[in-house]
């Protein structure tokens, strides 16, 4: 049984919101609370493993659980990328190359396993595991790309967000006006929404003198969490409404 949501506009809005929240929440833990990148990564990876196991053992699609796993990959991806790039001193370029290699290896193994990379056809526990590993490392890669655009490219936080937003728009146009595989375009868009969320998150939280809006990690995280919770509640309500006719027929 497929336990993943349908890919709609609401999905992409929630994905961007979750990745932006992941950026601000990850920075809140590692920097604002001064926990550090290494310890924060261990804490958040543990949360990811816990939520992932719950998702894998679930029998049906649960919007709350699904988006909790997405959020845990986003927060863990933030601190994992920062640990690689800053604590280990690899830098954004080297860190991104390593993460691209890992992500390509995951997709290659996924394809080699015989499972479909089309998320609407993920039916088995093995396929779902590949799906979540791809999401974890795509979010980590997206963080590194977002930090590079914001810090090293000269675009700044707002410029980086606009650049990634324009690139995502090109992917959307390619979906409707080219014959490029929709599966390939989905994963390209999925990776790109992460740096979009990362640069947007930095734009919201960083000081004015650094080109941000200076909302802070706590305030930004609370606002984004409120938006995401409201949308998850809406998704759960819609799912329950869809299930009611079937239950009525059985009774």
Where do the PLM segments sit?
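Polytopic alpha-helical membrane proteins, predominantly small-molecule transporters/carriers
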Residues: 1-251
């Amino acid at each position: 049984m497929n336990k993943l949501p349908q890919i709609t506009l609401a999905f992409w809005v929630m994905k961007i919101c979750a990745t932006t929240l992941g950026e601000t929440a990850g920075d809140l833990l590692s920097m604002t609370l001064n926990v550090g990148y290494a310890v924060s990564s261990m804490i958040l990876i543990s949360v990811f493993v816990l939520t992932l196991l719950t998702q894998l053992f679930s029998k049906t699609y649960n919007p709350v659980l699904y988006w909790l796993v997405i959020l845990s990959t986003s927060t863990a991806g933030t601190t994992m990328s920062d640990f690689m790039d800053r604590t280990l001193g690899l830098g954004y370029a080297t860190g991104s190359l390593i993460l691209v290699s890992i992500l390509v290896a995951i997709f290659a193994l996924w394809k080699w396993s015989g499972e479909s990379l089309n998320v609407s056809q993920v039916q088995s526990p093995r396929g779902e595991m590949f799906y979540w590993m791809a999401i974890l490392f795509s979010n980590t890669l997206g963080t590194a790309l977002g930090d590079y655009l914001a810090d090293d490219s000269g675009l700044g936080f707002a410029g980086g967000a606009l650049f990634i937003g324009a690139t995502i728009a090109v992917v959307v146009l390619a979906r409707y006006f080219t014959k490029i595989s929709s599966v390939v375009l989905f994963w390209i868009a999925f990776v790109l929404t992460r740096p979009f969320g990362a640069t947007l998150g930095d734009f919201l939280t960083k000081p004015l003198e650094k080109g941000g809006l200076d909302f802070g990690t706590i305030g930004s995280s609370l606002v984004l969490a409120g938006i995401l919770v409201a949308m998850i509640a809406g998704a759960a309500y819609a799912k329950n409404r869809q299930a009611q006719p079937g239950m009525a027929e059985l009774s």
